[in-house]
Every structure is written in C-alpha cells, then in structure tokens.
Amino acid sequence: MMKSNRILCVDDDADDLLFLSQAINDVSPETEIVQALNGIEALNYLNEVKRDNSPLPCLIVLDLNMPLLNGKDTFDRIKADPELLEVPVAVFTSSRNPSDKAHFLKFNVQLFTKPDSIIQFSHIVSNLLSLCRSQAG
C-alpha cells in the first residue's frame, strides 16, 4: 500500500497536538497532519484508511500516557497488523520512565521526550520529518 505525505499524531493532550502540528507545518507546510486523541481513534483511522485503500501515513507519532488505549498497546496493535508493519512509529512523550524507552528500543522505535524549549522542539520536528520523508512514496 502506498504511503502519503501525512503524519498521524496521537496524543490526548490537545495543546501538545496543536503545538506539534503547528511546528510540523511551519517546517513542512505540504505535510498533512491527522490528529487522534487516543489509541482507539488512531486505530479506527488506520482501519478506515486501509478499508478505503487510501495511502497510509508516512509516520505515526504516539504519546504513551493516554486514556482508553495507551501508547504501548496502540503500538503493539499497529505492529501486529501486516499492512501497517512498514509504517514507522515515533514515540513523543513526557514519560521519563526507563522501561518505556527500553520497550521501544527493542523495536528500533525512536523515543522523543517532550521538550522544554523551542530549540529542542525544532530538533525533534526535524527528526520526525526526516523519518516521514524516508518513508513517503
């Protein structure tokens, strides 16, 4: 399935979603941002994309601490779906728990801690966009 120039951002914090979306659009206005407030919304969106045979996102950015379905469980469900295996996932979280990092390192997933400064944020957005560009097809 073809990938798009679209990033799926999954975070229950509306302010973080807005900030991340704006930062991505500032650097890459051609990148479409799709937002989901939890893992269930994200999985529903991905199932709809597959059902419609639409292009998959070039990247999924997941928060870890979310209601209904947390980031780890969402990630596990995404990676259990053969059609989604090739879509890279990056974790963008306020968690500083070493076990969270260890879990995702097993899967070669980049984990970004939500930054305290604009400079750190810009660096993270650049890394996220490079992940997306390497996958867009």
What are these regions (language model features)?
Residues 62-63:
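Active-site residues of response regulator receiver
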Residues 3, 30, 55-58, 83-88:
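His-Asp phosphorelay/catalytic-motif detector in bacterial-type signaling
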Residues 90-92:
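Hydrophobic/aromatic residues positioned on beta-strands within the core alpha/beta folds
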Residues 73, 95-112, 119, 123:
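Alpha4 helix (beta4-alpha4-beta5 surface) of REC/receiver domains from two-component response regulators
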Residues 66:
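Receiver (REC) domain active-site loop signature in two-component systems and cognate sites
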Residues 35-48, 71:
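Helix N-cap/capping motif at the beta->alpha junctions
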Residues 14-38:
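Two-component/phosphorelay signaling modules centered on CheY-like receiver
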Residues 44, 72-85:
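Short amphipathic alpha-helix used as the core "switch/output" element in two-component signaling
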